[in-house]
Amino acid sequence: MTTPSTSTTPKTLYQKVWDAHVVATPEGEAPIIYVDRHLVHEVTSPQAFSGLKVAGRKLRAPEKTFATMDHNTSTRSASLDALSPMARTQVETLAQNCKDFGVRLYDIHHPNQGIVHVMGPELGITLPGTVIVCGDSHTATHGAFGALAFGIGTSEVEHVLATQTLRQLKAKTMKIEVRGQVTDGVTAKDIVLAIIGKIGMDGGTGYVVEFCGEAIEALSMEGRMTVCNMAIEMGAKAGMVAPDQTTFDYLEGREFAPKGEDWAEAVAAWKALKTDVGAEFDATVVLDAADIAPQLTWGTNPGQVVAIDAPVPNPADEANPTIRASMEKALDYIGLTAGTPMTDVAINKVFIGSCTNSRIEDLRSAAKQAKGRKVASGVTAIVVPGSGQVKAQAEAEGLDKIFIEAGFEWRLPGCSMCLAMNDDRLEAGDRCASTSNRNFEGRQGRGSRTHLVSPAMAAAAAIAGHFVDIRKPY
């Protein structure tokens, strides 16, 4: 856990957490940093554990490693028989590896099982000032708590399991400030899509981003997680938000959060985890929250995004020939014509879920749109809670009944249709309003067409059969 720095040089939040975790700086080599929490799942861990077995190594700190099953699990049944042969092998291998190495596992039958980036925070595994890694690109989610969190590759997973450390080069720093407050109908998802639309999908490359400003401070922890989750979609190494009372209120009493006197001591230390006055960033981006409308992607990367009241962009209006060619290619794949109002774009599939938008606040937002209405004819819509805890809470609030009565399918926790890795996938030609984080070609299935939106926008599209501006009656 990070302790307050005694240095008088103003530092950014990232610099404070980084400095507290550097354990060695070998000459001519990348620094070695300590890892506080290591999250693993069934897809990127098998080879790492296998490498340990071949080398005869044990885990350096098994109590700091937490495992779950999420990417390849079924959202229709908790039975192993519901899995494909490959998926079954992966989850069974993870279970055996966790048993062999003494790792805590939240398997498909555990009430707290879920998407790794949903489950970790709600259990209090994610804490301010910690370094968190996982073999998954959306590990940046945990940065919402003031943690330095980022995805790693399988060889690095093995290295962390064996040493609880990692070689890392220090990143540059970027401040993204969202000033003022958003208007009704605009959510955290719209904020982060607007940011990516402004700086592009590579605008954050080489940086750790700190999100700040009144609009970010006003977000719940669920909203902050949505924003940090998509830091990777702007090319950033990680995204962070300074912890505050909202953070502390969320964490207090959670299973792995400090208790008693340790809690008071932890909060005192966490309050120092903010960028100092006078600290310098390598880059700064500013947005006015009042200018942000509900967003949706029109192309094949998260940076190809527009406001709901805008038309499909025209490549001919783009001066840069490389960007123009990319736009033309995207429109050809996505099957849209420049100038078409986004509200005229019909969909036949809706996915509400993923590590971006499957928390209780997300489901409440979607249910508000669905209540008393019916899914449009020809539309298939599924709602996938991010964890067992989210599912139980949603059911206690009656959200499942709202969705089911409206014609949505209510599923078990898992990564589901975010990626075409399990049985929840799109067919060629399907057009999906999705609350996930990536709209690449084939991401949700070969030939599939994905539009990234907020949970409210996705639910509204399911009802209308096409995209709508949720700020207006429909």
Swiss-Prot record:
**UniProt GO BP:** L-leucine biosynthetic process
- Keyword Nucleus found: no
Question: Could you give a GO molecular-function term held by this entry?
Answer: metal ion binding
What residues bind [4Fe-4S] cluster, as annotated?
355, 415, 418
What EC class is this?
lyase
Cofactor(s) listed in the protein's UniProt record: [4Fe-4S] cluster
Per the entry, the cofactor note is: Binds 1 [4Fe-4S] cluster per subunit.
Q: Which PANTHER family match?
A: 3-ISOPROPYLMALATE DEHYDRATASE, HOMOACONITASE, MITOCHONDRIAL-RELATED
Q: What is the protein's given name? A: 3-isopropylmalate dehydratase large subunit
| Upper classification of the organism | Bacteria, Pseudomonadati, Pseudomonadota, Gammaproteobacteria, Alteromonadales
What gene name is listed for this protein?
Answer: leuC
